[in-house]
């Protein structure tokens, strides 16, 4: 309770600073229409959407046949909702490989209880190989943009994503 008494004026001052700073911008550029919409709602300003690029010379299909596993490529943090992919793959009896690392790794490994293979942080070459071998790439969390679906699709692999956020713009 003491913290809220102290934090309330600090948060009010930060909100004022945020508004004043936002009002000084000449133009807003967002990484997706989803983020541009948030800018419009919060700041009552228009924003252009410019998608981050994907290196389609590097991420491209080859002759690799899919191997029947699902793939998650992600930082292992709570908002990515990796546990949803673990549970869904376990229920569907589809092997799951998880590439990435982060503070939630130990928690997710306990949750998975052997139902997923954790690969850790990998090189871009290793990620590309995994995309090409995966039957499907999963994006279970809400992302402002999400580069993973574009890389996977550039490698010729289907993506199943949460139907919110930037994925609605990029998953075809």
Regions found by a protein language model. Name each.
Residues 106-125:
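Nucleotide-activated donor-binding/catalytic signature segment of Leloir-type glycosyltransferases, i.e.
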Residues 29, 62-97:
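Conserved donor-binding/catalytic core segment of Leloir-type glycosyltransferases
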Residues 31, 72-74, 99-100, 119, ...:
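Short hydrophobic "strand-cap" motifs at the C-terminus of beta-strands
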Residues 126, 140-145, 166:
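Active-site donor-sugar recognition loop in glycosyltransferases
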Residues 151, 164-172:
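Short acidic/histidine- and often glycine-rich active-site loop of Leloir-type glycosyltransferases
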Residues 2-28, 36:
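Membrane-proximal helix-turn-helix segments that form the acceptor-binding/catalytic region
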Residues 132-144, 157-158:
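Acidic donor-binding loop of glycosyltransferase active sites
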Residues 37, 41, 54-68:
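Acidic anion/phosphate-binding donor-loop and adjacent secondary structure
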